[in-house]
Structure formats: structure tokens, C-alpha cells
Amino acid sequence: MRKNRAEKRKVLPDPVYNSVLVTRAINAIMLDGKKGIAQKILYGSFDLIAQKTQKDPLEIFNKAVENIMPRLELKVRRIAGANYQVPTDVSPERKVTLALRWLVTLSRKRHEKTMLDKIANEIIDASNNTGASVKKREDTHKMAEANKAFAHMRM
């Protein structure tokens, strides 16, 4: 175990949109440290969003992330040999992390041809409160609601 808790690293805002959220999305998309490719993918999908919707892509992206963010999540707690899924509140930092993770992983599962199209369409869907990532949030909330009886078991 660590002596002290590791301090959070500051994420710098991206150069194009000057947004920390966009940088975090780029980092979520990035595979094997290839940040340049991840930037091309996200900025390209922002261009596609601008073409398709005729609106500011950053606004649509922020709305999409807000629609994906979960309020509750389930944590497994073992008590007397039984595992219980305990609903807990999600911290603001983790809300964003989960939203971006779900956005990227569920974008990768889509059936469009390129990653640009996949992410662009998932962001547009999420901003309209549809799509796989919003469904993931809804499923998480349903599970938390179903396990509300275990909420007294604090984490």
C-alpha cells in the first residue's frame, strides 16, 4: 500500500477547443499512447457533428456527456458470505470518467465504417438522449433502484 494518496494530475485543456473535457475524451479514445491519432479521431468527429447538426460541436458534446453521466452506481459489498450490490452516489469526477468511458467503449461497438463516424453518431445520439451510452446509464440506474433495499449498507 502507498504511504500517501497519489495526487491527481492536472489535465491541460486541448489547444483547439480550450476544454479540459475534450482532452479527457481524447485520452479516453487513445490506445497505446497514440494521442495524435486520438486527436484526429475526435476533431474529425466534431467536424462531422458540425456538418450533420449545423450546431457547435462542443455544445453538443457537453450535452451528450451530461446526458450519459450516472447519478448512482453499484458497488459490490461482501457481508456474511453473501455479495450485495449496494447503490452509492457517484462523485463528480467519476461521473465524467464513467460517461467518457461508456461513450468510447459503446462507440467502438457500433457498426459504422470508421471510428470518426462511430463517435460522431454516438455523441449526436447521446445529446438527443438516445443511443447505447444513455441506455447504459438507464440500466445502471434501474439496477440501483432494484437494489435500493441494500442502500443502508454503507461503503
From Swiss-Prot:
Any single biological process term in GO: translation
The keyword Ribonucleoprotein is assigned to this record: yes
Keywords carried by this UniProt record: Ribonucleoprotein, Ribosomal protein, RNA-binding, rRNA-binding, tRNA-binding
One Pfam family from the record: Ribosomal_S7
Cystine connections: none
Subunit structure: Part of the 30S ribosomal subunit. Contacts proteins S9 and S11.
Protein name (Swiss-Prot/TrEMBL): Small ribosomal subunit protein uS7
Naturally occurring in which organism (per UniProt): Mycoplasmoides gallisepticum (strain R(low / passage 15 / clone 2)) (Mycoplasma gallisepticum)
Gene name linked to the record: rpsG
